[in-house]
C-alpha cells in the first residue's frame, strides 16, 4: 500500500476522497507494531504508536485515535495533509552540548559533551549535580525538550544524577506517550538523546592535597611577614595539579589566628604572577580557610552555594583540601579566592577609580586606610585602594564623603536608591538572611564596592559575601550549627548596629525586590541548595575523616548534612511567607494600597485583553492558585462588597 499520502496538486474534494480511501486501507493493513504519522496542513506532525492505541476509526470526515486509557484524539480529515506509516521528515539533531562554567558556578572548566548517534557523554569536574546545559541544534527552528518541557540553552537547569532523555524536534510535533501513572498524553516528538554525565567526584577517594614546604622549613608565625615556599597541589583526579613557588603568611582575626605554628590557622597565599590553582580563574592572591570552629566545615561552602543561586557578585569557590605544611598534616581546609579587586574576585575594567570597602568592627587597617561614618560611627576599612601601593585617582576625603552621604541617607530614612545598586543589595541581604549570617549586623566582613567613585551616577554594590562561620543559628550560646533559630528575625537581631542593616532592608523598594527574588528562589533553587548539602558532604567526607583522626573536629558531618538541608528549607519557607505577607495585598490590582472598583475594572480588562502591564499579578491572584481567571474577579467583587 502507499506509505505516504500526499496529493499537493489535487483539488480539495479529490484530496479528501483519497485520504478517506487510504485511511480505510490503513485500517485493514495496519501492522501490529506500526506507527502512524499524521501531518497537518500547518506542518505539525502527530505520531501515534500502535502500542499506545486501542483503536483508530474514521467517520463523517473525522479520524480518531483512541489511547489505551480511553482518551480519544479526533481531527477533521480536511485539516490533514498526509497520513503515513513511515517517517519521511528529517529530524533535527544536537550539533553541540556542554556545561559551560560561565553558567555553572561549581563547574571549574567547561565540560564538552561527545555526541555519538543518540548518546551524549559529558565528564564534569565540580561539586554538585544540578547543571545548566549549553547546546546548539542543526536547525534554528528546532527545540529541545526534557519531560515535555522546552529547554533553553544557557538557562534551563536540571539535576543530572541519572541519565536524562532529551527530545530534539520541531514545535508542534507531538507523540502519544504512556505515562508512569498509566495515563496517556501527547508529548514533544523528535530525535531522542540520552545524556550521561560522569562526575569525577563520584570516582574520587580523596579531596585535593596541598603541600606547602617553606624554605628552610621555617614556621609560619606572622600575619604580616610572608615566608617563601613551594606549593604542590595534587588535584586527586578531579582538579588540575600544579607545582609553583609561593609566599605564605597567616591571616584572620584574633579568634581564628594563633602565633602557635601547631594550631589550625588560616593562611594567605601570594604568587609572583597570576596562576590557576585547581583550575580556578587566574589570580595572584588566594586563601586557605581553616574552618576552625567545631562543626563549621561546611558553612562557607553551603553559604557560597546559596550566594551563587541568589546571584550576588563575585561569589567565592570553596574547594575542600587536605593541607600539609612541611610534611605535617594541618587539617581539612577550604581553598578559595581572596576577596579584592582582581580578575578572580571583583573584576573591574578600571581599578584606578574604584573603591572596595569592608565594614568591620575589628577596624584593623592602618590609620590612613580606615574611617568611621559620621552617622552611627560604623567602622570602615578601605581595602582598595591601598594609598601607598596602588595607582588610584581617589582620595580619602572623596571616599569618606561619598560613603557618609549614603549611610546618612539610610539612617535618616530617606530614599537611598541613588547611592546603591538596589538589585545587588537585595541579593546580598537575601543571601545573608537565609543562612542567618549575623556577622554583617555587627558589622563584620561586610564588603561593598563602587566601580567609579568619580562618577556621581556610579553606585555602591554590596558583596562579595564573606565569612560565614557565625551563621546557621550558631552563636556564643548555641555553639551548634543548623539546629537553632531557623525562624529568627534577622533584622531584629539584638545588636546595637542593626539599624544600618534594618535601614537597608526596610528602605527604598528593597522589600518588593526581595519578594521577587524569593519567588524565583522557592522551588528548584531551594531544592538545589538543599541537595548541595549532601553533594558537598559526599565529596568532602574523606577529608572530614582525616580532620577528625587528627583530633581537630569530631562532628558527625553525615548527620549534619541532613540537618543543614532541613534547617535551610524551614528557614526559607518561613522568610518567604513573611515577605509575601508584607508585599502581597490580594485585590489591590493597581498597587495603590487600597481595594476599589478600579481594581475590578483592571482585572476584567486583563482577562479580556491579556495586557498585564497595568496590574500587579501577585495581588490579582485572589485565591493564590497561581492562575488569574474569573474566579479571582468574583472573589475581588465579594471582598469589595463585604468591605462596604
Regions found by a protein language model. Give the residues of each.
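Regulatory N- and C-terminal appendages and interdomain linkers associated
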Residues: 91-106, 182-245, 538-584
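Acidic, divalent-cation-chelating loop motifs in proteins
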Residues: 435, 584-590, 617-627
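Internal "kinase-insert"/substrate-recognition segments embedded within catalytic cores
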Residues: 212, 270-276, 290-292, 311-316, ...
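Conserved oxyanion/phosphate-binding beta-strand-loop segments in alpha/beta enzyme cores
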Residues: 227-290
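Bacterial N-terminal signal peptides
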Residues: 15-26
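Alpha-helical segments with a strong preference for the paired helices of cellulosomal dockerin domains
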Residues: 46-60, 72-84, 592-614, 625-644
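Beta-rich interaction/scaffold domains
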Residues: 36, 40-203
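Middle-to-C-terminal accessory/interaction subdomains
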Residues: 256-258, 262, 383-442, 446-451, ...
Amino acid at each position: 500500500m502507499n506509505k505516504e499520502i500526499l496529493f499537493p496538486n489535487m483539488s480539495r474534494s479529490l484530496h479528501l476522497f483519497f485520504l478517506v480511501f487510504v485511511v480505510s486501507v490503513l485500517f485493514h493493513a495496519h501492522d501490529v507494531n506500526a506507527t502512524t504519522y499524521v501531518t497537518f496542513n500547518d506542518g505539525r506532525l502527530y505520531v501515534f504508536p500502535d502500542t499506545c492505541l486501542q483503536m483508530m476509526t474514521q467517520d463523517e470526515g473525522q479520524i480518531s485515535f483512541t489511547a489505551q486509557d480511553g482518551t480519544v484524539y479526533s481531527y477533521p480529515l480536511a485539516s490533514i495533509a498526509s497520513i503515513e506509516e513511515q517517517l519521511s521528515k528529517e529530524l533535527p539533531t544536537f550539533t553541540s552540548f556542554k556545561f559551560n562554567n560561565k553558567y555553572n558556578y561549581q563547574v571549574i572548566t567547561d565540560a564538552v559533551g561527545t555526541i555519538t548517534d543518540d548518546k551524549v557523554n559529558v565528564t564534569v569536574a565540580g561539586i554538585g549535580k544540578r547543571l545548566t546545559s549549553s547546546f546548539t541544534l542543526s536547525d534554528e527552528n528546532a527545540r529541545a525538550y526534557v519531560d515535555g518541557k522546552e529547554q533553553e540553552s544557557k538557562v534551563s537547569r536540571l539535576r543530572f544524577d541519572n541519565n536524562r532523555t532529551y527530545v530534539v524536534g520541531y514545535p508542534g510535533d507531538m507523540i502519544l506517550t504512556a505515562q508512569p501513572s498509566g495515563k496517556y498524553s501527547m508529548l514533544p516528538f523528535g530525535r531522542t538523546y540520552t545524556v550521561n554525565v560522569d562526575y569525577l567526584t563520584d570516582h574520587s577517594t580523596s579531596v585535593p592535597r596541598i603541600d606547602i614546604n617553606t624554605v628552610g622549613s621555617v614556621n609560619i608565625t606572622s600575619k604580616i611577614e610572608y615566608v617563601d615556599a613551594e606549593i604542590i597541589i595534587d588535584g586527586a583526579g578531579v582538579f588540575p595539579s600544579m607545582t609553583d613557588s609561593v609566599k605564605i603568611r597567616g591571616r584572620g582575626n584574633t579568634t581564628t589566628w594563633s602565633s602557635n605554628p601547631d594550631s589550625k590557622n588560616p593562611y594567605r597565599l601570594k604568587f609572583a604572577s597570576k596562576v590557576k590553582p585547581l583550575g580556578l580563574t587566574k589570580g595572584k592572591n588566594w586563601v586557605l580557610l581553616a574552618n576552625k570552629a567545631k562543626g563549621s566545615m561546611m558553612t562557607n561552602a553551603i553559604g557560597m552555594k546559596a550566594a551563587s543561586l541568589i546571584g550576588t557578585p563575585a561569589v567565592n569557590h570553596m574547594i575542600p583540601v587536605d593541607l600539609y605544611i612541611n610534611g605535617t598534616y594541618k587539617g581539612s581546609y577550604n581553598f578559595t579566592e581572596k576577596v579584592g579587586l582582581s580578575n578572580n574576585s571583583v573584576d573591574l575594567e578600571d581599578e584606578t577609580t574604584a573603591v572596595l570597602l569592608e565594614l568591620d568592627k575589628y577596624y584593623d587597617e592602618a590609620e590612613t586606610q580606615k574611617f568611621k561614618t559620621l552617622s552611627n560611627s560604623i567602622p570602615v576599612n578601605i581595602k582598595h585602594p591601598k594609598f601607598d601601593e596602588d595607582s588610584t585617582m581617589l582620595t580619602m576625603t572623596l571616599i569618606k564623603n561619598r560613603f557618609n552621604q549614603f549611610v546618612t541617607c539610610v539612617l535618616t530614612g530617606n530614599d537611598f536608591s541613588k547611592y546603591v545598586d538596589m538589585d545587588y543589595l537585595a541579593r546580598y541581604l537575601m543571601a545573608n538572611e537565609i543562612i542567618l549570617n549575623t556577622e554583617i549586623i555587627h558589622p563584620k566582613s561586610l564588603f561593598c564596592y563602587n566601580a567609579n567613585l568619580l562618577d556621581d551616577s556610579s553606585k555602591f554594590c554590596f558583596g562579595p559575601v564573606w565569612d560565614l562561620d557565625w551563621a546557621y543559628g550558631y552563636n556564643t550560646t548555641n555553639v551548634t550549627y543548623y539546629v537553632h533559630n531557623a525562624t529568627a528575625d534577622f533584622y531584629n537581631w539584638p545588636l546595637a548596629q542593626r539599624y544600618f542593616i534594618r535601614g537597608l532592608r526596610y528602605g527604598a523598594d528593597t522589600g518588593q525586590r526581595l519578594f521577587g527574588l524569593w519567588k524565583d528562589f522557592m522551588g528548584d533553587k531551594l531544592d538545589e541548595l538543599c541537595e548541595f548539602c549532601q553533594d558537598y558532604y559526599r565529596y568532602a567526607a574523606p577529608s572530614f575523616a582525616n580532620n577528625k583522626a587528627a583530633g581537630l573536629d569530631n562532628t558527625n558531618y553525615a548527620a549534619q548534612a541532613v540537618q543543614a538541608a532541613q534547617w535551610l528549607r524551614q528557614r526559607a519557607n518561613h522568610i518567604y511567607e513573611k515577605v509575601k505577607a508584607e508585599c502581597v495585598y490580594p485585590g489591590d490590582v493597581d498597587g495603590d494600597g487600597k481595594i476599589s472598583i478600579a481594581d475590578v475594572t483592571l482585572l476584567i480588562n486583563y482577562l479580556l485583553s491579556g495586557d498585564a502591564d497595568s496590574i500587579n499579578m501577585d495581588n490579582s491572584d485572589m485565591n493564590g492558585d497561581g492562575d488569574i481567571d474569573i474566579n479571582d474577579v468574583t472573589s475581588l467583587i465579594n471582598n469589595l462588597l463585604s468591605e462596604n
